[in-house]
Regions:
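Glycine-rich phosphate-binding loops of nucleotide-dependent enzymes
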Residues: 2-237
């Protein structure tokens, strides 16, 4: 199994606060890997740095054989790494169709774009029903579907998902995680950050536990789900 993403000794700060303190992780082609930890552990900071929204102090981020640390976000998207950000962040005054168009803004392969549009609308049938509806008028669950669908329109090799179940009703949480599995079945590798550690460990192949900007544990997700320390800290055990 080939390594698609390799992060080594990543350090990231917000002003004088060191948010990520030497993090290393790998994501192999075809995997779902989850990064779990409490609020403020540095999970979203890690994803934002990988996707080019933040610049690291030091460290290496190699994606698909190329160093991307410190590169602009649009350059990273063009290489096939796309993020669905925390809090959905769709364009509320634009329709579903227009949001999806923006997801593909760096692409010029029109036939492939239309094929991907049909694929994401099949994945999220509600978006087909709401195709010309403005994003801001949709429910939270529908907006989350749109945020993920927009990221998929970038034709990612690696999809970064930041808290996809945040604020959703339990039935929608189940639907989102079922969809994550379907996305992987389409050949897309996934790095997932999720406050719902139990659900994340259920769908992931491997997991990393992040505390105060440092990786404290890592391993096969199903093994970590049974670990006493993980159970007590993150699974309500």
């Amino acid at each position: 199994m080939s390594v698609l993403l390799e992060v080594k000794d990543l350090k990231v700060s917000y002003g004088s606060i060191m948010a990520v303190k030497g993090l290393s992780l790998t994501v192999n082609q075809g995997e779902i890997v989850t990064l779990i930890g409490s609020n403020g552990a540095g999970k979203s900071t890690t994803l934002r740095t990988i996707s080019g929204l933040l610049k690291p102090i030091s460290g290496s981020i190699v994606f698909d054989g190329q160093e991307i640390a410190g590169k602009a976000g649009h350059e990273i998207v063009a290489k096939g790494l796309c993020q669905s950000p925390e809090g959905r962040r769709i364009f509320p005054r634009m329709s579903v169709r227009e949001n999806l168009d923006l997801g593909a803004f760096l692409r010029n392969d029109k036939v492939a774009i239309e094929a991907d549009r049909e694929r994401v609308l099949d994945l999220f049938p509600k978006l087909r029903e709401r195709y010309e509806q403005k994003g801001g008028t949709m429910s939270g669950g529908e907006q989350q579907m749109l945020a993920v669908a927009r990221a998929l329109m970038g034709a990612p090799k690696l999809l970064l998902l930041d808290e996809p179940s945040m604020g959703l009703a339990p039935v929608l949480v189940d639907m989102i995680f079922e969809t994550i599995i379907k996305i992987r079945e389409q050949g897309i590798t996934i790095l997932l950050i999720e406050q719902n550690a139990s659900a994340a460990l259920d769908v992931a192949d491997r997991a990393y536990v992040l505390e105060s900007g440092l990786i404290k544990m890592s391993g096969v997700a199903s093994d970590l789900a049974k670990d006493e320390a993980v159970t007590k800290a993150y699974l309500g055990g």
